[in-house]
Amino acid sequence: MIVWTCLLTLAGCGKKDMDYTMQNESSVAESVRETGEESVLIQNEDAGEGENAAPETKYITIDLSGVGEIHPKGDAVLPLTLKIVSEEENGIDFANEWYESKQLSLPMVGKEWNNFYDDEYQYIWSGDALYIYENISGNCLYVLEYPTDKWYINGNNACLLDDIFYGISVTNGYAQPDSCFMFAYDLENNKILWRSGDQTCNTMNFIVKKDVIICGYGFTSEKDYLYQLNLHTGEVIASLELKKQPDLLVPQDNMLYVHTYSYNYTIEMQ
C-alpha cells in the first residue's frame, strides 16, 4: 500500500502568503449560507448593483455517475517529448526533502493541502466542496461538488481555463471500472466535454502545458505511467512507464520533477 503520510509532509513546501487576503477554510465554511442549489454567496455584502456589485457565486454539482469515456472531435495535439534524465531510489523518503533539495515548491497556500492557486484563480477545498476565487477581485465564482476520494482532496488537482473546469475523479484502491479519470466540464453551460479512460490519473496533482495535460497513474501490482492527455479531447496521446506510481509533479523551466513511492525522477520536457 502507498504510504500517504509521507506525501502529506510536502504541505510545508508551498507558498504560504498571497498578495491579497483570502478566506481560509474555516471562514469559508462560516460564510456560506446555502439555501439549495440556487443559493449564492456574495463576497461583499455592502456592494450594491452596478460596477461594484460582486457576481453571484454559482453552485454546481457535477454528476459523473454513468458517464463513460468521452472524447469529442478536436484538433490533433502533439505530445511533449519526455526524456528521463535521472532515476534515483529515494528509500521511501518524504517528498518535501527531495523538492527542497532542488529548491522546488508547489503553488500552495498554508499547510493544510486544501488551498492552491494559479495565475488567475485560487482553489480551496472545504468539506466536499471546491471553492474557486478570482485572484484580482477575491470574488468566489464557483462552488463545485463532484465525486472523488478524500485521499485526493489535496495538491493541485483542479484547474479553470476559459470557463472550462478540469478535474480528477479518483478512487483509492486497485483498478476498477469508472475510477481514476480526468474530466473537463463547461461551467457556463453545465455540460461535460470529455472524460478520459479509467486508470489514467491518480496523481495528487496534474500539470497543464499549453494543449497538453500531464498526469499519471499507478498502484500496487499495476504498471505505473506518466500520461499526456489532449487538453481538448481527453485522449491519451503519449505515455512514459515509470518504476513506481507517480504521486507529485513539479515543473520548472523545461524540467519535470516527479516524486514516486520509492523513486525520484528528473525528466526533460521538450
PLM feature segments, named:
Residues 129-131, 181-183, 225-227, 263-265:
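A short loop-to-beta-strand structural motif that recurs across blades of beta-propeller domains
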Residues 250-270:
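Blade-level signature of beta-propeller repeat domains, shared across WD40, Kelch, NHL, RCC1
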Residues 14-16:
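Bacterial signal peptide processing site
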Residues 69-70, 79, 107-117, 149-161, ...:
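Repeated scaffold domains used in trafficking and secretory/extracellular systems
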Residues 9-12:
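C-terminal motif of bacterial Sec signal peptides marking the signal peptidase cleavage site
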Residues 135-137, 186-189, 230-233, 269-270:
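Short loop/turn segments that connect beta-strands within beta-propeller blades
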Residues 124-125, 173-179, 218-223:
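Short, solvent-exposed loop/turn segments at conserved positions within beta-propeller repeat blades
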Residues 50, 54-110, 139-149, 191-197, ...:
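Aromatic (tryptophan-biased) beta-strands that constitute blades/sheets of beta-rich domains
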